[in-house]
UniProtKB/Swiss-Prot annotation:
This is UPF0235 protein Sputw3181_1321. The lineage of its organism: Bacteria, Pseudomonadati, Pseudomonadota, Gammaproteobacteria, Alteromonadales. It comes from the Bacteria. InterPro entries: DUF167, YggU-like_sf. It holds the Pfam family DUF167. One of its GO terms (cellular component) is cytoplasm. It comes from Shewanella sp. (strain W3-18-1). Belongs to the UPF0235 family.
Amino acid sequence: MSAVVQQQGDLLLNLYIQPKASRDQIVGLHGDELKVAITAPPIDGKANAHLSKYLAKAFKVPKSDVYIIKGELGRHKQIRIVTPKLIPPEVSELLE
């Protein structure tokens, strides 16, 4: 499976998360996943909440439209973004 898949207007992202980074950013490909660095530590769900907020801002959607499908407790996550208003260039170049 590829890092980014478009499904009926939604985006399905396979992510590798790097918590406690110096800044929030979409880094690029990491194997067959998209690497995302976030500043939040992986404690008490802070990283997941921060990731959802960061992705919502990057794709111009409400936080309620960002779903963690798989990987709630790990670094490897599958995320669904419902009808993104904007697709960051790092992601659009990976679309099939």
